[in-house]
């Protein structure tokens, strides 16, 4: 048997799914269409989708988690005050963890500004933060002396690297596709509602209803029948 090429099969599958979604939408009555439109408009009025809000919460968790680990590291290495002076005031690229904390602050500011305040629908902001984070951490791991300072020399760079890439995956595979799908659904529902408004309403059963004969008409027929039978009785 001849098999269709893969791209033709994908095209047929996509067209069938789109036709199925259109049939599903057109099969809904106008009241349900209006309810769906109002629900989508309500989501638009909220300003930010649920999945985007979850992404922003994860970005905040990234900053707080790295900050917590850095504070623990300051306590372990001789007290917060003394270690803070050593890592911030007398900053040394080869032995300080302060730059990893600043890297988390950089990710937080760029991502919250881009995807919560400006509500971007593009991946360039997350690509910037992930590229900067990956390049900086790789350079620091290769050039610095963090591994000689105990467990935190491994933990902080690895955690920062993993969190940055989880944010990238979540935005690219969850936030942007889901919001695009919801927008397409809204357009389909609005188009279906506009077409439904142009289609005349179907004929109801009441338009084909024939009322029963009235009692007045039946009484008149009975009187006429009696009058026609009277001459026959007289004979």
From Swiss-Prot:
Residues 225-235 have a biased composition (Basic and acidic residues). Residues 10-20 have a biased composition (Polar residues). The chain crosses the membrane at residues 54-74, 98-118, 123-143, 151-171. GO terms for biological process: vesicle tethering to endoplasmic reticulum. A motif (FFAT) lies at residues 208-213. Its main location: membrane. It is found in: Late endosome membrane. Keywords: Acetylation, Endosome, Membrane, Phosphoprotein, Transmembrane, Transmembrane helix. The FFAT motif mediates interaction with VAPA, VAPB and MOSPD2. The MENTAL domain anchors the protein in endosome membranes and exposes the START domain in the cytosol. It binds cholesterol and mediates homotypic as well as heterotypic interactions between STARD3 and STARD3NL. The modification N-acetylmethionine is found at residue 1. The modification Phosphoserine is found at residues 15, 21, 27, 193. GO terms for cellular component: endoplasmic reticulum membrane; endoplasmic reticulum-endosome membrane contact site; late endosome membrane; organelle membrane contact site. Belongs to the STARD3 family. Tethering protein that creates contact site between the endoplasmic reticulum and late endosomes: localizes to late endosome membranes and contacts the endoplasmic reticulum via interaction with VAPA and VAPB. Residues 48-218 form the MENTAL domain. Residues 1-53, 119-122, 172-235 are cytoplasmic. This is STARD3 N-terminal-like protein. It comes from the Eukaryota. InterPro entries: MENTAL, STARD3. GO terms for molecular function: cholesterol binding; protein homodimerization activity. It holds the Pfam family MENTAL. Residues 75-97, 144-150 are extracellular. Residues 1-20, 202-235 are annotated as: Disordered. Homodimer. Interacts (via the MENTAL domain) with STARD3NL. Interacts (via FFAT motif) with VAPA. Interacts (via FFAT motif) with VAPB. Interacts (via FFAT motif) with MOSPD2 (via MSP domain). It is a multi-pass membrane protein.
């Amino acid at each position: 048997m001849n098999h269709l090429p893969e791209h033709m099969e994908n095209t047929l599958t996509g067209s069938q799914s789109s036709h199925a979604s259109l049939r599903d939408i057109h099969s809904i009555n106008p009241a349900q269409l209006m309810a769906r439109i109002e629900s989508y408009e309500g989501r638009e009025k909220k300003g930010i989708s649920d999945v985007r809000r979850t992404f922003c919460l994860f970005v905040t968790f990234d900053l707080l988690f790295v900050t917590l680990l850095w504070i623990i590291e300051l306590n372990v290495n001789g007290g917060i005050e003394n270690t803070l002076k050593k890592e911030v005031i007398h900053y040394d690229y080869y032995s300080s963890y302060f730059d990893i904390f600043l890297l988390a602050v950089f990710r937080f500011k760029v991502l919250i500004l881009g995807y919560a305040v400006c509500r971007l629908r593009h991946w360039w902001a997350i690509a910037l933060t992930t590229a900067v984070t990956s390049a900086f951490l790789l350079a620091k791991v290769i050039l610095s002396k963090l591994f000689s300072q105990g467990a935190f020399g491994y933990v902080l760079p690895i955690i920062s690297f993993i969190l940055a890439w989880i944010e990238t995956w979540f935005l690219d595979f969850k936030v942007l596709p889901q919001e695009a799908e919801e927008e397409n659904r809204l357009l389909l529902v609005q188009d279906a509602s506009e077409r439904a408004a142009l289609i005349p309403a179907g004929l109801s059963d009441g338009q084909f209803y024939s009322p029963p004969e009235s009692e007045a008409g039946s009484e008149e027929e009975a009187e006429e029948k009696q009058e026609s039978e009277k001459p026959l009785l007289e004979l």
